[in-house]
Amino acid sequence: MLGTRVTRAVYTRAPLKLQLRALGLHRRYVHNGSKNDEGSSTSTTTNKEENDKKLPDVYPQMLALPISRRPLFPGFYKAVVISEPRVMKAITDMVERQQPYIGAFMLKDSNNDTDIIHDISEVHELGVLAQVTSAFPSKDEKTGKETMTALLYPHKRIKIDQLIPPKDVKIEDIVVEKVVDNEVASEETKDEETVDKTESATDKVSEEITEEIAKAPSTEVTEDPDNYENPTDFLKDYNVTLVNVSNLEDEPFDIKSPIINALTSEILKVFKEISQLNSMFREQIATFSASIQSATTNIFEEPAKLADFAAAVSAGEEEELQEVLESLNIEQRLEKSLLVLKKELMNAELQNKISKDVETKIQKRQKEYYLMEQLKGIKRELGIDDGRDKLVDTYKKRVEKLNLPENVQKTFDEEITKLATLETSMSEFGVIRNYLDWLTSLPWGINSKEQYSIPRARKILDEDHYGMKDVKDRILEFIAVGKLLGKVDGKIICFVGPPGVGKTSIGKSISRALNRQFFRFSVGGMTDVAEIKGHRRTYIGALPGRIIQALKKCQTQNPLILIDEIDKIGHGGIHGDPSAALLEVLDPEQNNSFLDNYLDIPIDLSKVLFVCTANSLDTIPRPLLDRMEVIELTGYVAEDKIKIAEQYLVPSAKKTAGLQNATVSMDEEAINALMKYYCRESGVRNLKKHIEKIYRKAALEVVKKMSIEDTEPLVSTSEEPQLSQTNQNISSSSAEDSTTDLEDSVNPDTAKEASKPNNSQEGASVEETKKAVKTEEEEDTSMIVPEDIKVEITPEDLKKYVGPPIYTTDRLYETTPPGVIMGLAWTNMGGCSLYVESVLEQPLHNCKHANLERTGQLGDVMKESSRLAYSFSKMYLSKKFPENRFFEKAAIHLHCPEGATPKDGPSAGVTMATSFLSLALNKPVDPTVAMTGELTLTGKVLRIGGLREKVVAAKRSGAKTVIFPKDNLNDWEELPENVKEGMEPLAADWYDDIYKRLFSGVKKSEGNNVWKSEFELIDKKKKEND
């Protein structure tokens, strides 16, 4: 063989002669020990000693297998699962070649599940030499991947000297080593066979290796070439991790050492305690004891094996077990094993305690179940079964479908236990049963699916209501925020506006748009706090509050609850203040744990959308008002009312009157005349009543015409016969009294079914009700009106349908005399025109002294405003017209019409001052001018509220010019264009701005001499008297 050998530097472990000898020994060991590959799973000392004799002192390169989670200990079997195909093939080949030896090393990262070691830093350097006793294919249940399960028997501790990772060969990994051995003959061809061609990384490296070999001196081999073959060279073909290792022997120790004996005794003591708690440990200890006794009768002679056994059977931490494996000092190994074993004892004691507790609970439940079954049997035999068990089962089945919070579940368990032990004749039984009925009827954990479609919501809102831009925009904002967040929290919104503008009905539309259930209740006149918070359940007839009833009715935790007439809630009753109880309900920071007196458990109302309605904010308590987001709804102008009447009111009234198939029409001029002469209020409720009245009379007229012409009633040929008008009225009235169901409003088919009469009538059976409805359907079928019968409603026909006009003119005054001014006021009904009249009580020459009389049920604020306006007018007139002595003698009477209506507020200051000046100058003001504003003594015009309502009222009264404070100019700009259309604004900062607009045509001479004749007469009388 050639004297020079080229190989990897990491393969160089010993002189070539020593390596070849070791290989020969290893080959003989495999051959002799192959019969033990299928040995038992329990190690014995005899087998171990026999194997130790067969194991060589020096090993060739072997396969390195990483082990995760816990290391292997010599003498104790362990099964490992291998998923890497290369390693699986290599192990299969090793077993077939009778070379089943590997190095097993624990991974430092337990999460790194691999069968290949790429770097020595990935594993602990100290491991064990293990024998693959058996290997069989398996399958990963999770991934379905083919794997291999190998049973390993560790022999002794080893340490990695060099790691050969499965990488491509690099140039720096190749070296040329010259070995001169006189016992080896030189032969070029034999040396070339020793070169492993599969380890060359590139063609260039192979050429360099060949050139180096050719230059080497030749010697002649004297031994059989087969003896020099490395038995593990075949592993290089699988590209797996190989290692060169060295043996590690335990440090010498004194068997008679008291420390070692004490540690051994303590370990045996712990083993005894664990064996009493864990049967699995007991079996393992017995097996280990048998194996020790077969070799020696004294366990104290084998402390190293005892330490390894203690670590091998313990479920300790990875690092602790690895430290035991790495301890070559027997005393230290025993100490570390004892620590691990002590922890195992603690775990066993804890596990035993848990097991006993669980067993005790199971036995208790089993005993209770057994006794209850016996009790049921006894009751059945005695015939005293009271149905209580069925009731308990019913409640439990209900709860299974709900997602009860922990505190609610605890309360339910307590109450159901009480119910099961009480007699049905006891009064408390009925109380608990009613309580559980309510508790299990609430929608715990049930929410209706949120609707985030803005086009759909806009369509629904526009279908049901005209205008209301602020309300619709707020709801769309609410949906948009919910869409971005992925959830919708509850809100508290308050709609404030005059009656008839659609506050309640818009709540129903919002529930449809949001896909939420709808519940409405009114708090107008409510004086009992129990209506909100519920009664204590100890009272007879106790019930939860309206909020809990709403949740039960809607069966969702996120309904829309409309609290109607919140401004009319009672105060100061003997049963508490309901408005104070609403503070908790309508506070977003508190209603997530609302406590009802009846249920007495926290209820989450944070997902509920509360909508409140009110006509005025003045009567709502301030703390309650602060918790709500106020949206003001103003009255409608004429154009809005026409659109609402044409799109909503007329079709609805026509259908209600049964004229949907008849040729009955009401043109726009008739609607306009109806609003002008009959319905001038802000809302459309009165307009709806008049339109329904008109169509009812039209229906009577149609029937009369058909009777005159002797037209026989024709049965409708439609597939679905319609119910009588009486039944429709009954159905509609009952629907108004009850809460509207959202699903019925969304689904037309369901709504159609809901409009049918209720089959469960009071005092009649179901069969009788069905017969009665069937009879009514047969008798009262709808009629088809002939096409030649037509009714057209014109403005001239309104008197015939709804009587004489209530309002004959647009304004109270078509032409205003001096001292009469159109003011504007805000009321709970919306805006209205409020005239201010001032006249002289008698001619100036007959007045003894100047004074001011006020009538019209004026409040204190308006009285002060009139006094202020009177003083300001005297001052202003003296500055403008010094010779006008009107206020020296004038006895003025100021009146505001409709004296039965109380009036108050500061915004009539400019109107009163203008009335006084108009009277003083004897100059009438344009009757199409309306004004509002608070006045100071110096003539400053201050800001007022309710400008939108006042402008609407001014337009409704036929005003063309509106005078308002300059500070309200932004409010004017925010008004809709249809409201501002045809109106001329005048934003006054000082009263001079108003005077220039109204009295600009009054010359100085005219103003000074307007009362000249009267004062000449007064002066003449005065001289005569003197």
From Swiss-Prot:
Pfam families: AAA, Lon_C, Lon_lid, LON_substr_bdg
GO BP terms: cellular response to oxidative stress; chaperone-mediated protein complex assembly; mitochondrial protein quality control; mitochondrion organization; oxidation-dependent protein catabolic process; regulation of mitochondrial DNA metabolic process
Chemical reaction(s) catalysed: Hydrolysis of proteins in presence of ATP
Gene3D superfamilies: 1.10.8.60, 1.20.5.5270, 1.20.58.1480, 3.30.230.10, LON domain-like (2.30.130.40), P-loop containing nucleotide triphosphate hydrolases (3.40.50.300)
InterPro entries: AAA+_ATPase, ATPase_AAA_core, Lon_bac/euk-typ, Lon_lid, Lon_proteolytic, Lon_Prtase, Lon_prtase_N, Lon_prtase_N_sf
Subcellular location: Mitochondrion matrix
Domain of life of the organism encoding this protein: Eukaryota
Every Lon N-terminal domain range: 62-345
Main location group: mitochondrion
Function recorded in the entry: ATP-dependent serine protease that mediates the selective degradation of misfolded, unassembled or oxidatively damaged polypeptides as well as certain short-lived regulatory proteins in the mitochondrial matrix. May also have a chaperone function in the assembly of inner membrane protein complexes. Participates in the regulation of mitochondrial gene expression and in the maintenance of the integrity of the mitochondrial genome. Binds to mitochondrial DNA in a site-specific manner.
Subunit annotation: Homohexamer or homoheptamer. Organized in a ring with a central cavity.
Protein name, per record: Lon protease homolog, mitochondrial
Lineage, opening ranks: Eukaryota, Fungi, Dikarya, Ascomycota, Saccharomycotina
Gene name as annotated: PIM1
